[in-house]
């Protein structure tokens, strides 16, 4: 491109940095960053966000933090990128510190911000803070937003707070496979097998197609040998839908069959 005399612009560099968001390409990404800094374009917030995302995805959080803290003209996209990086590393204290700092600097959290917050609140130490954030969303326009709602449902599910998870599920005006799978998981984790199966059936009645995560969640609800037929039905459903080749689901099926002494059927999963 450059040999042909075409000078790469900001969009070009951002696209390349996105490709470099894999550890094996990090060296190339750093070279691009230095090249860009040489052209005095690292003052651009979009470029800075792309570089921070690259470092974060490659596991170089310290480098991402350094760039973030030394960049003056932050926008909400940059704040959200940093929140997401902390959230992905389960750094819930840093997430809340950054959230407070962001608001103090005049940036109101968006739904993307809240998804990061609730994802990190699955940490057992963050239950009270998560409830406080949820309460603050009651009168906000995206309090029942699909993506935010799924994150809240997952938050309550991981804390075994079944009543709150159920209330969130019922309040959501839009539901997708993640929503239904989350509710099934909530019931399964609390040992309510019958309710988990009912949600699984209703999900299909609503024409929502279960995925691998759904089936793994419903398998966890089959906590009694009397439910062996349900395990077989789930296995058969997975085969019909072409989901039986997934390693995680296959492992779950093997474990369930083995748990109830059905070694022959466990081997059949292979």
What are the residue ranges of the model-derived segments?
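Hydrophobic or amphipathic alpha-helical targeting/insertion segments
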Residues: 3, 7-14, 19-25, 109
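Inter-helix linker motif
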Residues: 5, 38-40, 71, 75, ...
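Pentatricopeptide repeat
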Residues: 9-14, 29, 44, 48-49, ...
């Amino acid at each position: 491109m450059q040999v042909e005399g075409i000078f790469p612009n900001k969009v070009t560099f951002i696209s390349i940095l996105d490709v470099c968001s894999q550890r094996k390409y990090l060296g190339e990404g750093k070279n691009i960053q230095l090249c860009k800094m040489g052209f005095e374009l690292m003052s651009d917030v979009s470029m800075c966000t792309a570089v921070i995302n690259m470092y974060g995805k490659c596991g170089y959080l310290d480098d991402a933090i350094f760039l973030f803290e030394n960049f003056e003209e932050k926008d909400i996209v940059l704040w959200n990128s940093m929140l997401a990086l902390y959230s992905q590393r389960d750094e819930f204290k840093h997430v809340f510190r950054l959230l407070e700092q962001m608001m103090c600097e005049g940036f109101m959290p968006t739904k993307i911000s809240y998804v990061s917050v609730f994802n990190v609140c699955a940490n057992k130490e963050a239950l009270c803070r998560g409830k406080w954030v949820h309460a603050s969303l009651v009168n906000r326009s995206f309090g029942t937003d699909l993506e935010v709602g799924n994150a809240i449902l997952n938050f309550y599910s991981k804390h075994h707070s079944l009543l709150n998870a159920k209330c969130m599920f019922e309040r959501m005006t839009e539901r997708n496979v993640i929503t239904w799978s989350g509710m099934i998981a909530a019931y399964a984790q609390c040992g309510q097998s019958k309710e988990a199966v009912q949600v699984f059936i209703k999900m299909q009645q609503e024409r929502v197609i279960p995925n691998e995560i759904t089936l793994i969640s419903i398998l966890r609800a089959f906590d009694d040998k009397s439910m062996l037929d349900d395990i077989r039905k789930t296995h058969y459903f997975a085969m019909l839908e072409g989901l039986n080749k997934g390693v995680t689901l296959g492992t779950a099926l093997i474990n369930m069959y083995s748990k109830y002494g059905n070694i022959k059927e466990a081997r059949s999963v292979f």
